[in-house]
Amino acid sequence: MGNETSLPMDMCSNFDADEIRRLGKRFRKLDLDNSGALSIDEFMSLPELQQNPLVQRVIDIFDADGNGEVDFKEFIQGVSQFSVRGDKLSKLRFAFRIYDMDNDGYISNGELFQVLKMMVGNNLKDTQLQQIVDKTICFADKDEDGKISFDEFCSVVGNTDIHKKMVVDV
């Protein structure tokens, strides 16, 4: 599969050629059926994602064309956001997209509830979770439109070091 060598280097600006080769090897190991793309099951074999309750959202974001699989180009572009050389804004945008499930540029009350539900499972009653969601929206929603924009999201989490935790070794 010569796919990884035909990628334009500007697309992978957070990785050098050596890292791309290593990622290519890793991708081929994960691609158990040699289809040239990772299914959800193949993607789930990544140790970094196995215990992550948001794995489906990560896959949805990596799967840029929405065909249900992650090809090598999508894999590189997705993982690139977690490079140590990735910038803070890109990492914050990725984190925002985890919550922005319908990709409309806003985190609605319902979206925040769904994502938090993925994280807490049944550890909280839905009424308790809804209270947390409502308080979070009230706190972050500076223009009082009932939803959280990317700028509002950044003003809340941008001062944290979350972007420093969004790193994978290649």
Swiss-Prot record:
Its Gene Ontology cellular component terms are: calcineurin complex; synaptic vesicle
- Note in the entry: This protein has four functional calcium-binding sites.
- UniProt similarity note: Belongs to the calcineurin regulatory subunit family.
PROSITE patterns hit by this protein? EF_HAND_1 (PS00018), EF_HAND_2 (PS50222)
> Which of this chain's residues are annotated to bind Ca(2+) 3?
100, 102, 104, 106, 111
Please list the GO biological process terms of this entry.
calcineurin-mediated signaling; neurotransmitter secretion; sleep; vesicle-mediated transport
- Which is one GO molecular function term here? calcium-dependent protein serine/threonine phosphatase regulator activity
- Pfam families with a match to the protein in the record: EF-hand_7
Show the InterPro entries listed in the entry.
EF-hand-dom_pair, EF_Hand_1_Ca_BS, EF_hand_dom
Q: Which Gene3D superfamilies match?
A: EF-hand
Under the subunit heading, UniProt states:
Composed of two components (A and B), the A component is the catalytic subunit and the B component confers calcium sensitivity.
* Residues of the EF-hand domain: 18-46, 50-85, 87-122, 128-163
Q: Explain the purpose of this protein.
A: Calcineurin is a calcium-binding and calmodulin-binding protein found in all cells from yeast to mammals, and a calcium-dependent, calmodulin-stimulated protein phosphatase.
| Protein name as catalogued | Calcineurin subunit B type 1
What are the protein's UniProt keywords? Calcium, Metal-binding, Repeat
Q: Which residues bind Ca(2+) 1?
A: 31, 33, 35, 42
Residues that hold Ca(2+) 4 according to the record:
141, 143, 145, 147, 152
Q: Which domain of life is it from?
A: Eukaryota
Q: Cite the binding residues for Ca(2+) 2.
A: 63, 65, 67, 69, 74
